[in-house]
Amino acid sequence: MVKQLKFSEDARQAMLRGVDQLANAVKVTIGPKGRNVVLDKEFTAPLITNDGVTIAKEIELEDPYENMGAKLVQEVANKTNEIAGDGTTTATVLAQAMIQEGLKNVTSGANPVGLRQGIDKAVKVAVEALHENSQKVENKNEIAQVGAISAADEEIGRYISEAMEKVGNDGVITIEESNGLNTELEVVEGMQFDRGYQSPYMVTDSDKMVAELERPYILVTDKKISSFQDILPLLEQVVQSNRPILIVADEVEGDALTNIVLNRMRGTFTAVAVKAPGFGDRRKAMLEDLAILTGAQVITDDLGLDLKDASIDMLGTASKVEVTKDNTTVVDGDGDENSIDARVSQLKSQIEETESDFDREKLQERLAKLAGGVAVIKVGAASETELKERKLRIEDALNSTRAAVEEGIVAGGGTALVNVYQKVSEIEAEGDIETGVNIVLKALTAPVRQIAENAGLEGSVIVERLKNAEPGVGFNAATNEWVNMLEAGIVDPTKVTRSALQHAASVAAMFLTTEAVVASIPEKNNDQPNMGGMPGMM
């Protein structure tokens, strides 16, 4: 394919136009008075959302250079979402501010490498100051506050807080669509482990890339399955029952994996293969946990059992299994309650007896998976469009809450970033490095400025007053009042704020040091017009 090139200022300005188009679409959503964005969907109803990363992912621009700029900011949103699960709009606003200010300086003759060093230096100091100002999340109310702020809905914050209370801070919480109007919380026994499907062709929902199995059989073995013939007798019994099967094994490979995928694609049966969790002795113990939870028998040489001789009554069952690329969740296993209780008691005894912190931590994880269960937030709404929007908000709020439990909370509403302004301004630097520090200083005020503008106020006035306010005191855009943000429950997770700043700075620094851009030339439409027929011809 033929390529086209742009250099230096032409390249950067073209990419900046793309950055601005994406960021301008995303930043209207920030703050309590932020607006929604409507996304066109080809085969379904339009999606209405205020989720930054969802909007960013939808944007494709016609001009290849502008599209590259947009993709860079998309990367900021994606990375922040991966690490912290929220804060994507803040990250986008920060990235745009740094790129715009940095480009002004590069155009004026500043050295981009010096600017990058200054940006890195400033971000490092800002992150350290954020951690110093961070407070631990210690009670149910604080967890609810974080969720409520992220979702802009107190009810959602309360549901997440209750879910975390019931299954623990590290427990498994899933979000499902409800058939009714109301949102409900349900806790079901279940187990999750960090192993996903062995082939993407096993998914049942290609949009979400998830395999969902209803009332599946579950084969638990510590063996490697290489030959399809080894499991064929068992699969024939499963096919007759017309139910799906989850295969948890040391490894499913070669002929066995190929035939499972082929039969899945032909619709002969639904089977999902996942690797057994853990390693060594811990793997055996975790397989036993899964077997007890589901009522299965572990097919292992230790018990003299062979896959060829396995029958359907050796399989476990569960009401539902969900398998993603990275995780498997078994919900409501049909194991014997007395056996589960005995296993829980055994694990508790082992936790008390062990002297190793590492072993204790792993045993506690197993106990939580066996006894803690899975909390399910069932999202209700009056229409499908509202349901999707509400579900996205709850997902963000859950991620935000987990991040808060992990690294603590800071003052919300962009206040935390302005609170570290003083520390960053004290950095001693010269020349282009100092200019790089100043780029970050200006960007630190961008989220507050945008929140104020979305509330119909003059952002510069709010920023100047905030710089002179007591630490922790900020502007509540929902009520147009100046309050102590932490006391008012307007908080952001430290991890979210930190990640947004770090990823925005990373992409901005790369953008500023760009000197040439190579893009593909769009293919022209070569369709020829229809030729006129001769008289009497079609």
Curated annotation (Swiss-Prot):
Enzyme class: isomerase
Record's keyword annotation contains Chaperone: yes
Its job: Together with its co-chaperonin GroES, plays an essential role in assisting protein folding. The GroEL-GroES system forms a nano-cage that allows encapsulation of the non-native substrate proteins and provides a physical environment optimized to promote and accelerate protein folding.
Any one biological process term the GO annotation gives: protein refolding
Similarity field: Belongs to the chaperonin (HSP60) family.
Taxonomic source organism: Staphylococcus aureus (strain JH9)
Protein name, as recorded: Chaperonin GroEL
Summary of subunit composition and partner proteins: Forms a cylinder of 14 subunits composed of two heptameric rings stacked back-to-back. Interacts with the co-chaperonin GroES.
Reaction(s) catalysed (UniProt annotation): ATP + H2O + a folded polypeptide = ADP + phosphate + an unfolded polypeptide
Pfam family, one: Cpn60_TCP1
Highest taxon of the lineage: Bacteria
Gene3D superfamilies membership: GroEL, GroEL-like equatorial domain, TCP-1-like chaperonin intermediate domain
InterPro entries on file: Chaperonin_Cpn60_CS, Cpn60/GroEL, Cpn60/GroEL/TCP-1, GroEL-like_apical_dom_sf, GROEL-like_equatorial_sf, TCP-1-like_intermed_sf
